[in-house]
């Protein structure tokens, strides 16, 4: 039998057309029409149902970060600036593929590698490289096989694996999240059904770190709470604790028997040094604490679309690390089966090849340096233009690709509606999407929005 269609015949859903059992039942008049149509070898049947089974599903709100880019693309103004999404751009505001990434991809082509499935835990060479990059190759935790590393779908997917582990094996545990934090953190823990609350972090009065509030809230949390920490370049504020403050944070977490859960999305990209940006994580591991760490290579290698990252669990014994790894694999299997290979090979080749590794560090320093230059230029432009006496030095004290401007929602809306500057509504701007040439324009927009919009 074949499926034949008659464009002219459309069967509308009404009281004469009934669905019953496995067949459609027609009135006598409709049956004759149907028979005539069938005899002409051209049948078209479209059952238009008035009410969808999905009618009760509400429309989801646009993503607060990715939605910024959608609005930016719809704007036809020549002056428009996209400072919403954290993706590195050149001085010409073009996407940048690292030269070292191109070299690694050429090596892969020369080897003629296949596209077979990876193991559930990912590419072994990547997992080894990423743990060593995070902790240092000579770290006792690695040598003692106390690190369970599973390749995840970039930072988001790796955090999600960690959240699922908490939900499954730490019933009743809560996660403490900084106020503010990256927009997706709360979604991830909500989706994993892990309860969370916030600890104080940003002080709007000083546009700096509320360190006393942070310590008080971590102390007040029930024993055994998971504390989500940004390893470096805090998103969205760009405000990091000092080394001395990290020591105090570690003291309190250790005293309260909490479990630190680090999100390391910018290793090497914040300061330009891979080791400096991993110092906070290494401090906690050196203290003998058991630690969870999610990693991402979206920013520091520009592998945004490759979705390459890892979840690392540093345990107190090799036996517990092995059990944790087995359960992370068990969680990953029904979620996505196994991770993508392309980005994993890029990372493994670059970290494992001394020449490529050195080249990567040079490129990373270049990218971090460009952002530092833009940060300085923006501060200089605002300081020279604004005669109000306001102290804008917080811009220089922040680190990484973001600056937390202190602008409220109305002021951020003015930035977009009047100045065509697209940013998140919490006042965060991505300096990675700014050029030196655009700093004067952005300074005018910030000054106008800050002083003339409440």
From Swiss-Prot:
It comes from the Eukaryota. Its EC number is 2.6.1.1. The modification N6-(pyridoxal phosphate)lysine is found at residue 299. It is found in: Mitochondrion matrix. Its cofactor is pyridoxal 5'-phosphate. The keyword Phosphoprotein does not apply. SUPFAM superfamilies: PLP-dependent transferases. It catalyses: L-aspartate + 2-oxoglutarate = oxaloacetate + L-glutamate. Keywords: Aminotransferase, Mitochondrion, Pyridoxal phosphate, Transferase, Transit peptide. One of its GO terms (cellular component) is mitochondrion. Residues 1-49 form a transit peptide. Homodimer. Belongs to the class-I pyridoxal-phosphate-dependent aminotransferase family. In eukaryotes there are cytoplasmic, mitochondrial and chloroplastic isozymes. Important for the metabolism of amino acids and Krebs-cycle related organic acids. In plants, it is involved in nitrogen metabolism and in aspects of carbon and energy metabolism. This is Aspartate aminotransferase P2, mitochondrial.
């Amino acid at each position: 039998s074949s499926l034949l269609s008659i464009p002219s015949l459309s069967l509308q859903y009404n009281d004469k057309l009934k669905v019953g059992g496995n067949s459609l039942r027609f009135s006598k008049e409709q049956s004759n029409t149907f028979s005539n149509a069938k005899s002409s070898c051209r049948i078209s049947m479209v059952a238009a149902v008035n009410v969808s089974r999905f009618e009760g599903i509400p429309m989801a709100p646009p993503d607060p970060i990715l939605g910024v880019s959608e609005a930016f693309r719809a704007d036809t103004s020549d002056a428009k600036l996209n400072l919403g999404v954290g993706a590195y751009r050149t001085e010409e505001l073009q996407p940048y593929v690292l030269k070292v990434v191109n070299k690694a991809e050429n090596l892969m082509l020369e080897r003629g590698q296949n596209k077979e499935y990876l193991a559930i835990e990912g590419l072994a060479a990547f997992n080894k490289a990423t743990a060593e990059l995070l902790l240092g190759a000579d770290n006792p935790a690695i040598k003692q096989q106390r690190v369970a590393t599973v390749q995840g779908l970039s930072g988001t997917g790796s955090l999600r694996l960690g959240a699922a582990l908490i939900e499954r094996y730490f019933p009743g545990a809560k996660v403490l999240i900084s106020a503010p934090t990256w927009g997706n953190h709360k979604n991830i823990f909500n989706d994993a059904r892990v309860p969370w609350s916030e600890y104080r972090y940003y002080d709007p009065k000083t546009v700096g770190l509320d360190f006393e509030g942070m310590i008080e809230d971590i102390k007040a949390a029930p024993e055994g709470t998971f504390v989500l920490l940004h390893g470096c370049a805090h998103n969205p504020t760009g405000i990091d604790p000092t080394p001395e403050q990290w020591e105090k944070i570690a003291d309190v977490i250790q005293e309260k028997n909490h479990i630190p859960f680090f999100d390391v999305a910018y290793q090497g990209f914040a300061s330009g040094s891979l080791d400096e940006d991993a110092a906070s994580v290494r401090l906690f591991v050196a203290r003998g604490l058991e630690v969870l760490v999610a990693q991402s290579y979206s920013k520091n290698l520009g592998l945004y679309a490759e979705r390459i990252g890892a979840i690392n669990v540093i345990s107190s014994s090799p036996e517990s690390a092995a059990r944790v790894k087995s359960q992370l694999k068990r969680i990953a299997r029904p979620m996505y089966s196994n991770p993508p290979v392309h980005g994993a090979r890029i990372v493994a080749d670059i970290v494992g090849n001394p020449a490529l590794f050195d080249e990567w560090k040079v490129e990373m320093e270049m990218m971090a340096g460009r952002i530092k230059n833009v940060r300085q230029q923006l501060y200089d432009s605002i300081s020279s233009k604004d005669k109000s006496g306001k102290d804008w030095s917080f811009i220089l004290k922040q680190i990484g690709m973001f600056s937390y401007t202190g602008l409220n929602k109305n002021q951020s809306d003015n930035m977009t509606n009047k100045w065509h500057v697209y940013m998140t509504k919490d006042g965060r701007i991505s300096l990675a999407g700014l050029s030196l040439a655009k700093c004067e324009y952005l300074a005018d927009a910030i000054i106008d929005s800050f002083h003339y919009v409440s």
